[in-house]
Amino acid sequence: MDVYSAGSMQDSCIASVIDWLEFGSSFFRPLGDAHDIGLFGPASAGMPAVEATALFAFIHGLAAVQVPFTLEGKGLNRRHSAGLALQAFRYCLHTHVSHSRELPAELAWGGTGMSPKIADQLALAGEVLAELLTDADREECARLIEYEADANMLLPFHLEHLDHGYFRRRPPVPTGRFGTSYPESNAWRVSVLARALLAAPGHGHASRWEEALVMHLANVLSVPADAEDTTPVDGCLLHELHAGANLHPSFALEHHGFFHPGYVNRTLLSLFSTAYAYDDAGVERPSLLLRNVPELWDVQRRLLLWDGRLAYPAGNDYPRYCWGLLYLLPVLAFLQHEYSDGIAAWAEERLVDLLIREQRVNEDGSFCGGRLEQWRELIEDEGVAPPGRPAPSVYYRSQVDTPYYMALAWWWHNRNGQGVEVAPVDVDGALDRPFVERDCGLVFHRAPERFASWSWPGAAARGRSSCGVAGQPHQPLPGAGRAMRPPGPQPSRARLRWRLRNGGYAR
């Protein structure tokens, strides 16, 4: 199939990824004189450069081995993509602390709070590269995953684990609002522990991996009611595993100090990757793996705007159309195949269209190169000293994230046979309900043609109100409370008002 003959939404998606390959390859470089390994972006970006390189390996691995398109019409070829993918994959393996290769110490990564996420991304890259990997590659990847699983075995007394939280770093603050939680951290620990167990069930540490897996599973999408839940789990009761709630009672998720839909997507992404790992191994999924997923998705889907974007009632702390929004793409693919969710299909089509439209504005195949060009210039200007210079890791991740998550969504559709039948759904009617989470001072309502919200606190510790209209940009509003008036005949018009009471709760 020629890339220009793409017809379906999934075909358009992967064709867009192929259009990115030449631009993305311009950021890839060998590591010094070592021509067998290379990385995406500068080594000075630290461990985030490893993550960006793992994503790059997946993208080129897919292009080299899996996609049904001919690349030659784009001036590319599979052999070249295979070489880049293997160099990137091996860079991630060889810089890990479990590897014996002597490389500069500052490049080493592993055994930290975020490294299980990268281990899972490497495992996914290994899936698409499977036929190109050597026995040494497979052994080194298995050793890396075992190392990360060992690093996440239970510590005594539920102590905080390294640098990125452990179950919950601290109890809720006195107001009852959580502010900081770690569902996504526990979820990617679940992934690496599960992958280690599935690959080596007879390993000497398998029983401790299993113990840690169950504990982390119980504390991913945990809610306050779990503290008294007597559901039997792996020989004990759920409340005995409960280390603290990571979601509010109505399934709102806070992170970075405010309601953060992006981390819902990141959490679900790790859980869904784990679900497919169990399926591929022919092993039954743990009963806790998808616990509370439908309830959490019922909140998340009411944030879907008409062009595929997410609303962020409390604000956002990442670049527009980047990071948390992009995690949504493979999440939507999984939801369609697992739950036959028609709203997920509706949202995916619109989000892909939004991303491709921006790519077409750029002449170099990039997704966000145009609007982030000034950022790149500041990063590469040696005369600009931090904190004036943006973090290189965020810029380079932003460049590789979009094609990666589009490619991963395609891969997950492909493993399920591409086509998914979902019943027609009245999207606006299904999502037309107000949502209130008093625990975190949040109220929002997605009506058929309007979205309005109020959140206290918000990003940068500020209260935020916003309103969006179908077909128009979603904009913050000045002031506090607003009346929401969904359109329609006067007799059927609903109206909801709110104001702040009791130290910031929305009533």
What are these regions (language model features)?
Residues 1-102, 227-228:
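Low-complexity, Ser/Thr/Pro/Gly-enriched N-terminal "stalk/linker" regions
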Residues 8-26, 74-90, 210-243, 287-297, ...:
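An acidic intrinsically disordered interaction segment
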Residues 29-46, 101-113, 117-124, 163-188, ...:
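Carbohydrate-binding/catalytic loop surfaces
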Residues 88-164:
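Well-ordered mid-protein domain cores that form the structural environment of catalytic cofactors
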Residues 124, 131, 143-288, 301:
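Active-site lining segments of carbohydrate-active enzymes
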Residues 260-334:
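Long, repeat-rich segments with strong aromatic
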Residues 282-286, 306-311, 321-507:
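Extended polysaccharide-engagement surfaces of secreted carbohydrate-active enzymes
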